[in-house]
Swiss-Prot record:
Organism annotation: Arabidopsis thaliana (Mouse-ear cress)
Keyword Mitochondrion included in the entry's annotation: yes
Name of the gene: MTX1
Gene Ontology annotations of biological process type: mitochondrion organization; protein targeting to mitochondrion
Protein name: Mitochondrial outer membrane import complex protein METAXIN
Example of a GO cellular component annotation carried by this entry: mitochondrial outer membrane
Record key words, sorted: Acetylation, Coiled coil, Membrane, Mitochondrion, Mitochondrion inner membrane, Mitochondrion outer membrane, Transmembrane, Transmembrane helix
Spans through the membrane: 195-215, 284-304
Lineage, broadest ranks: Eukaryota, Viridiplantae, Streptophyta, Embryophyta, Tracheophyta
This protein's record includes keyword Mitochondrion: yes
Null allele phenotype: Decreased growth, abnormal leaf morphology and ectopic floral development and sterility. Higher starch accumulation in chloroplasts and reduced rates of mitochondrial protein import.
Residue ranges with Basic and acidic residues bias: 267-277
Length: 315
């Protein structure tokens, strides 16, 4: 496998950077950090074609592709397929399983809640929708908020109770992780693991992407050793390795041909009548796409409008 790693070109395709993070996507950042902790050379490419796709991030090399929505996510797929496995000697430990439950279950649940509900989606535009027209971005935001509430089991009747439960679990998870970590470099003494990738991603995203009014952010900052842990690993593995970054790639879904990262410059050519007609049709297509999204959300949501508007009714 080591010989293959020296010859293969690996690419992680993620959502674009923002908030001084290499990728602002909370699903993409753990995969990026995992590869950095493993010191596996790879290129970072960005895909904004499908802003709400659950396939992102994905990892590819030649004909091999690991998608986020398959086999437990990119990191689990890379471990399973023997590409890179930081947890090979840890997965049987009881501590590993209990910490994974805290990080991948409770903290991931809390972050999902905070992004879409707790902070009312303040950060989501920069992460997912900044390249889209305002109206379409709003429609997709309401759709994703509805889906997030469904995943978290939030209804109009139990919203307050679920909020308290989610924040309580997050507080307990931070307390347990802070105690476990102490002043160690990694969660498991002197070696990085996938759990470090998830935890470091969680901490960096909360501190750098969420507003200062975030409840989850305030709870995290109560544990100074968790913040120091993140600062040290960020400095060693993220900032040091990005001192001479490779030029960014523009990536398309793996079934599409990828453009060269350095296209040749072409002289500006006057648009023909046919090109002008095509551009006009594209505008109509965009409008039709928007209407399709609205109809889809209306049909899919059914009762979702009640859930999204119940706060206004209480007012």
């Amino acid at each position: 496998m080591e010989g293959d790693q020296e010859t293969n070109v690996y690419t992680l395709v993620a959502r674009k950077p923002s908030f001084d993070l290499p990728t602002a996507c909370p699903n993409c950042l753990p995969a990026y950090i995992y590869l950095k902790l493993a010191q596996l050379p790879f290129e970072l490419a960005f895909n904004s074609t499908f802003p709400d796709s659950d396939e992102l991030p994905y990892f590819e090399s030649d004909t091999y592709v690991a998608y986020n929505n398959e086999d437990g996510g990119v990191i689990e797929k890379l471990k399973k397929d023997g590409i890179v496995n930081l947890d090979s000697q840890l997965q049987s430990l009881s501590d590993y399983l209990s910490l994974k439950a805290l990080i991948v279950s409770w903290l991931e649940e809390a972050l999902t809640y905070e992004i879409w509900v707790g902070t009312e989606g303040i950060s989501t535009s920069k992460i997912y929708y900044s390249d889209l027209p305002w109206v379409i971005s709003k429609v997709l935001f309401y759709k994703q908020t509805y889906l997030a509430k469904n995943r978290l089991g939030i209804t109009k009747e139990n919203a307050e109770q679920r909020e308290k439960q989610i924040y309580k679990r997050a507080s307990e998870a931070y307390e347990a992780l802070s105690t476990r970590l102490g002043e160690q470099k990694f969660l498991f003494e002197d070696r990085p693991s996938s759990l470090d990738a998830f935890l470091l991603s969680h901490i960096l995203f909360i501190i750098q992407a969420l507003p200062v009014t975030s409840v989850l952010r305030c709870k995290l900052l109560e544990h100074s050793n968790l913040v120091r842990y993140a600062e040290k690993l960020k400095s060693e593995f993220l900032e040091a390795s990005s001192s001479s970054p490779s030029p960014p790639l523009h990536s398309f879904p793996s079934s599409f041909p990828r453009k060269s990262s350095k296209p040749k410059s072409k002289p500006k050519v006057e648009k023909t009548e046919e090109e002008k007609k095509f551009k006009k049709r594209a505008r109509f297509f965009l409008a039709a796409q928007f209407l399709a999204v609205v109809i889809y959300v209306s049909v899919m949501g059914g009762g979702s409008s009640d859930e999204l508007e119940y706060e206004d009714e209480d007012d």
